Structures are given as structure tokens and as C-alpha cells.
């Protein structure tokens, strides 16, 4: 087993290093929505310009479009404010949805049995970048 290229003293340093590698990104964690349903919306905006993605999200008739729009807006603001990118050149470089923890609830059924209802959560990540930059 090889040693890692760079070691970190604590979790905070590791998180700061991740932020340095991914300019213009935003994450929404524990969104109370199924990842499968959120992915349908995220797949539409991947690779589009930020302005086009905002317009699309405004008119997509799915409830997942609201949290995705909030994350996109946050990523755009981070890119403009923290990384000093130009708004006209921004596009959605990466957009993905990971499954968060699942809340399990019991529903009583006949003869003393019960069914489990899985209330799924999602982690939405969007990374924006300038066109021409990799």
C-alpha cells in the first residue's frame, strides 16, 4: 500500500484543500427528496451555460427543480464572488446527486405486521466553471 501524496493534520485542512481544487461549487445536503427524482432534473442542466440552466429550471414542472436552482444560484455566486469569474462565461461543469441517509418509518398493517416506508434524502453538488478554462 502506498502512502498518500499529501497528508492533512485534520479534517478542516482536508476540506480547505478540496475547496481549493473545485472553484465555483456548491452543495446542498440532506434534501428531503429521492435522488432518482433529483437526477432527472440535474441531467437536464449538465453542460449548459448557467443562464440557460436557470431558464430551464424556472420552467421544469418538477419539485426537484427548486432545490437544484438554489444550489446553482449558490455555485454561481461563489464563482463570481470568491473566484472572480465572469458571469457571461459560466457553464455547469459538473452536476451530480448522491444519496444521503434514508429515514425509515413504520406503517402498521393487519395482524400485527408493519411495512417500512423509506424517506430518502439527497446531496446535490454543482460545479460551475468558465468556458475555455479547464
From Swiss-Prot:
Gene3D superfamilies noted in UniProt: Ribosomal protein L22/L17
One Gene Ontology MF term: structural constituent of ribosome
InterPro entries: Ribosomal_uL22, Ribosomal_uL22_bac/chlpt-type, Ribosomal_uL22_bac/org-type, Ribosomal_uL22_CS, Ribosomal_uL22_sf
Function description: This protein binds specifically to 23S rRNA; its binding is stimulated by other ribosomal proteins, e.g. L4, L17, and L20. It is important during the early stages of 50S assembly. It makes multiple contacts with different domains of the 23S rRNA in the assembled 50S subunit and ribosome.
Highest taxon listed in the record's lineage: Bacteria
Record key words, sorted: Ribonucleoprotein, Ribosomal protein, RNA-binding, rRNA-binding
Transmembrane stretches, start-end: none
CDD domains xrefs: Ribosomal_L22
GO BP annotation list: translation
Family: Belongs to the universal ribosomal protein uL22 family.
The name this protein goes by in its record: Large ribosomal subunit protein uL22
SUPFAM superfamilies according to UniProt: Ribosomal protein L22
PANTHER family from the UniProt entry: CHLOROPLAST 50S RIBOSOMAL PROTEIN L22-RELATED (PTHR13501), LARGE RIBOSOMAL SUBUNIT PROTEIN UL22M (PTHR13501:SF8)
Keyword presence, rRNA-binding: yes
Quaternary state and interactors: Part of the 50S ribosomal subunit. Contacts protein L32.
GO-annotated cellular components: cytosolic large ribosomal subunit
Amino acid at each position: 500500500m502506498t502512502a498518500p501524496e499529501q497528508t492533512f493534520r485534520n479534517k478542516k485542512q482536508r476540506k480547505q484543500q478540496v475547496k481549493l481544487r473545485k472553484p465555483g461549487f456548491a452543495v446542498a445536503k440532506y434534501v428531503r427528496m429521492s435522488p432518482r427524482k433529483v437526477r432527472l432534473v440535474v441531467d437536464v442542466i449538465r453542460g449548459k451555460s448557467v443562464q440557460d440552466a436557470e431558464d430551464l429550471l424556472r420552467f421544469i414542472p418538477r419539485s426537484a427543480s427548486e432545490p437544484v436552482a438554489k444550489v446553482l444560484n449558490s455555485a454561481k455566486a461563489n464563482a463570481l464572488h470568491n473566484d472572480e469569474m465572469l458571469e457571461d462565461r459560466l457553464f455547469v461543469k459538473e452536476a451530480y446527486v448522491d444519496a444521503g441517509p434514508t429515514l425509515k418509518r413504520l406503517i402498521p398493517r393487519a395482524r400485527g405486521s408493519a411495512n417500512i416506508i423509506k424517506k430518502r434524502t439527497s446531496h446535490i453538488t454543482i460545479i460551475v466553471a468558465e468556458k475555455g478554462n479547464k
